[in-house]
UniProtKB/Swiss-Prot annotation:
One of its GO terms (molecular function) is tRNA dimethylallyltransferase activity. It catalyses: adenosine(37) in tRNA + dimethylallyl diphosphate = N(6)-dimethylallyladenosine(37) in tRNA + diphosphate. Catalyzes the transfer of a dimethylallyl group onto the adenine at position 37 in tRNAs that read codons beginning with uridine, leading to the formation of N6-(dimethylallyl)adenosine (i(6)A). Transmembrane segments: none annotated. It comes from the Bacteria. Its EC number is 2.5.1.75. The gene is miaA. It comes from Escherichia coli (strain SMS-3-5 / SECEC). This is tRNA dimethylallyltransferase. The record marks 108, 130 as: Interaction with substrate tRNA. It holds the Pfam family IPPT. InterPro entries: Dimethylallyltransferase (IPR039657), IPT (IPR018022), P-loop_NTPase (IPR027417).
Length: 316
């Protein structure tokens, strides 16, 4: 698309970043200054009753800056990147029609990618193929399947952890059904986003700082009643660790503790480690992201001013 035709498109802002990087605080600050409406881009914040462990904006923050696409699913329900793209496009159109600018904030990079580039033509799930993969995993272990994926699709294998059976089996399933790798197919994009997008990523300057913030926030969640929140979900009786909601970072580890599989201290250790691993994956995505303007979490006023400098011209 030419620069002239791109300039005629409606405007949008992406505010991306790893967990615990200060995205929400910056988005709320920007809403006070710019004519923006916030849309959450987070695969955990969609779930009702999952507030503490997801660091969902609190009532005061939501009063100051309402977020769209929060609390739109029960934890028993699935929600795909395709669902997100459909819902986000509808919200963006609504915001644009009101003469305001959509500000999409979150850390689910797959959602941002699906929105920006469109969805690739991946084959639908095949229960027979999936059952065959799971049978092989039961006999040989997921490590063996991960080695198989390394031979078939080394790019996907580098991105998918051997302990992530859902994504691992999906990558193999796609290849067995289509004869093409997940990497090949995901490079075939769908409809591009019909907006002129200003993209920002916020993160601390050092990994050590991010690790500290993650550990502090996990302990704050525990002090705020995270265990009681997960106990309420656990007591429902219809939720389990095969659901995307309960596989969310922190929830999965607390669930293992409630089931008596691990000690409290082990749960805390694993929860912090899993959150750090999530942040590492998010940063890896962002480092390969084109056209992104980096902001420093430790300098919030400077970060705000940099956004205003870049997008100030579009706010009129």
């Amino acid at each position: 698309m030419s620069d002239i035709s791109k300039a005629s498109l409606p405007k949008a802002i992406f505010l991306m970043g790893p967990t615990a990087s200060g995205k929400t605080a910056l988005a709320i600050e920007l809403r006070k200054i710019l004519p923006v409406e916030l849309i959450s881009v987070d695969s955990a914040l969609i779930y009702k009753g999952m507030d503490i462990g997801t660091a969902k904006p609190n009532a005061e923050e939501l009063l100051a800056a309402p977020h769209r696409l929060l609390d739109i699913r029960d934890p028993s329900q699935a929600y795909s990147a395709a669902d997100f793209r459909r819902d986000a496009l509808a919200e963006m159109a609504d915001i644009t029609a009101a003469g305001r600018i959509p500000l999409l904030v979150g850390g689910t990079m797959l959602y941002f990618k699906a929105l920006l580039e469109g969805l690739s033509p991946l084959p639908s799930a095949d229960p027979e193929v999936r059952a065959r993969i799971e049978q092989q995993a039961a006999e040989q272990g997921w490590e063996s399947l991960h080695r198989q994926l390394q031979e078939i699709d080394p790019v996907a294998a580098a991105r998918i952890h051997p302990n992530d059976p859902q994504r691992l089996s999906r990558a193999l399933e796609v290849f067995f059904i289509s004869g093409k790798t997940l990497t090949e197919l995901t490079q075939t994009s769908g409809d591009a986003l019909p907006y002129q997008v200003h993209q920002f990523a916020i993160a601390p300057a050092s990994r050590e700082l991010l690790h500290q913030r993650i550990e502090q926030r996990f302990h704050q969640m525990l002090a705020s009643g995270f265990e009681a929140e997960v106990r309420a979900l656990f007591a429902r009786g219809d939720l389990h660790t095969d659901l995307p909601s309960i596989r969310c970072v922190g929830y999965r580890q607390m669930w293992s503790y409630l089931e008596g599989e691990i000690s409290y201290d082990e749960m805390v250790y694993r929860g912090v480690c899993a959150t750090r691993q999530l942040a590492k994956r998010q940063i890896t995505w962002l480092r390969g992201w084109e056209g992104v303007h980096w902001l420093d979490s430790e300098k919030p006023e400077q970060a705000r001013d940099e956004v205003l400098q870049v997008v100030g011209a579009i706010a009129g």
